[in-house]
Amino acid sequence: MLKGSPHRWLTGPIFDYIQQRGGKLHLRHRVKQVDYSEGESPEITGLQLGTPEGDIRVEADAYLAACDVPGIQKLLPEAWNRYPQFKAIHQLEAVPVATVQLRYDGWVTELGDAQEAQRRDVATPTGLNNLLYTADADFSCFADLALARPEDYRKEGEGSLLQCVLTPGDPWIPKSVDEIVAHTDRQVRELFPSARNLKLTWSNVVKLAQSLY
């Protein structure tokens, strides 16, 4: 797991590293076409980009694409399907996923039944500090971000911030946010009976019909 939010601890430092070495980041630039040479071993000769100022063509010494499954499928030239490795990419199917965040007024994963006072003491974090897995809920993995990544997710006066990943997400994509939150909250309380009396203070749901996985 990252120490905190991806922008602060992953993409941000990568961007800083590139900028410090003279690189530039161009947002709102979309690859419309990959230009390449013909022959048995074609090479990329340039990229046709759509930009806010109009279409442009760029050439480079090297080309690197970091895409999700739908993105790389759109990017690859159709003619490259004659190569098995590129044709195989079109066989991939992205898995739907729903990510649910639930904030409580105490510490959910404190397991001691006799530790009610400790569970309610939001000034003193307690519980399971790790990425967790369960076979007894519809979320395959979860973590208390307030414990595992307090730099970005701990909030004064609040307790646990559970992030739960619902997979497979197919049944959840058409559901309303309220339904998903209620269902996930109920399963959290079933997994941790000692936390049943905690109050859910905030929630958020992100649904991806085509995830990165």
Regions found by a protein language model. Give the residues of each.
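C-terminal segments that line or cap access tunnels to active or ligand-binding sites in enzymes
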Residues: 48, 53, 60-62, 67-213
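Helical element adjacent to the flavin cofactor pocket in flavoenzyme catalytic cores
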Residues: 1-62
